A protein has these predicted regions:
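Mature extracytoplasmic/lumenal regions of exported proteins
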Residues: 118-122, 143
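Sec-dependent signal peptide recognition
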Residues: 2-8
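Membrane-interfacial alpha-helical segments at the cytosolic side of multi-pass membrane proteins
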Residues: 137-147
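N-terminal signal peptide c-region/cleavage motif recognized by signal peptidases
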Residues: 14-16
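Active-site recognition of the HExxH zinc-binding catalytic motif
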Residues: 124, 128-136
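Metalloprotease/metallohydrolase-associated module, dominated by Zn2+-dependent proteases
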Residues: 20, 24-109, 153-199
Length: 199
C-alpha cells in the first residue's frame, strides 16, 4: 500500500515537473503611495458663518464640496521580450491621494460650544474622506497582486493589454465601492456631516 501511494506521488511529480506555469510567479509588486492632506482657510465667528463661507471656498478649492478626496492610480510593467514568451520582471503601482479639508482660522476665539460643533464636523469629514482613501489603498493592494500573477503571454503588447484590463476592472470595482459608501452614508451625513443639502 505504501509503495502504491509513493508511486502515485512520484508519477504526479514527474507529470508536473516539466509543465510550464500558465501564470507568472515570484514577481515583485512595488507600491508607490503618497497621501497629501491639504487645508484651505475659512474664517468666521461661528459654524453657521463658516458653512456659508465654505459654500464659496469649497466650490473654488474642492470642486464644489466642503471636503474632497481625489486620487490617481496608475501601473507599469517592467517586461523583457524573449524567444518563447514575454518575461515579466516587475510591477509598479503608483497612487496619489489628495485629501482637502477646511481649516478654521478663528477657532480659538469661538465659544466652546461652537468649537465642539466644528470638531465633530471635521472628525466626520476626516472619517468620510478616509474611508475613500482606505477603499483606494485596498484596490492598490488588490491590483498589485493581480498584476504580479498575470497569465503568461508570448507578446509583451498582449501582456500590457491584459494588465490594462485588470486595472480597468479594479478601477470599476473602486468606483462601485465609492458609490456604495456615498449611498450608505448619505454622502457623509450619517457619519455626522450634517450640513444643509445645498452645501
Amino acid at each position: 500500500m505504501v509503495s502504491k501511494v509513493f508511486m502515485v506521488a512520484l508519477m504526479l511529480f514527474a507529470a508536473t515537473a516539466g509543465a510550464e506555469s500558465s501564470h507568472y510567479t515570484g514577481i515583485k509588486a512595488v507600491p508607490d503611495i503618497k497621501v497629501d492632506f491639504q487645508f484651505y482657510r475659512v474664517s468666521g465667528p461661528d459654524v453657521a458663518s463658516l458653512a456659508r463661507q465654505m459654500t464659496n471656498a469649497g466650490t473654488a478649492r474642492a470642486n464644489g464640496h466642503i471636503g474632497m478626496a481625489s486620487y490617481q492610480l496608475s501601473w507599469q510593467l517592467q517586461t523583457r521580450p524573449e524567444a518563447q514568451r514575454c518575461e515579466l520582471e516587475q510591477v509598479r503601482v503608483t497612487t496619489r491621494i489628495k485629501v482637502m479639508v477646511p481649516n478654521w482660522m478663528d477657532k480659538a476665539r469661538a465659544s466652546a460650544a461652537e468649537r465642539q460643533k466644528w470638531d465633530k464636523l471635521v472628525a466626520a469629514m476626516f472619517d468620510y474622506e478616509s474611508r475613500h482613501k482606505d477603499i483606494l489603498l485596498e484596490s492598490v493592494s488588490q491590483l498589485g497582486i493581480q498584476l504580479a500573477q498575470l497569465s503568461v503571454e508570448r507578446d509583451c503588447a498582449a501582456l500590457e493589454y491584459q494588465a490594462w484590463q485588470r486595472g480597468q476592472g479594479v478601477l470599476a470595482s473602486s468606483r462601485q465601492r465609492f458609490s456604495q459608501l456615498q449611498q450608505q452614508t448619505d454622502h457623509g451625513r450619517k457619519l455626522g456631516l450634517n450640513w444643509p443639502k445645498g452645501i
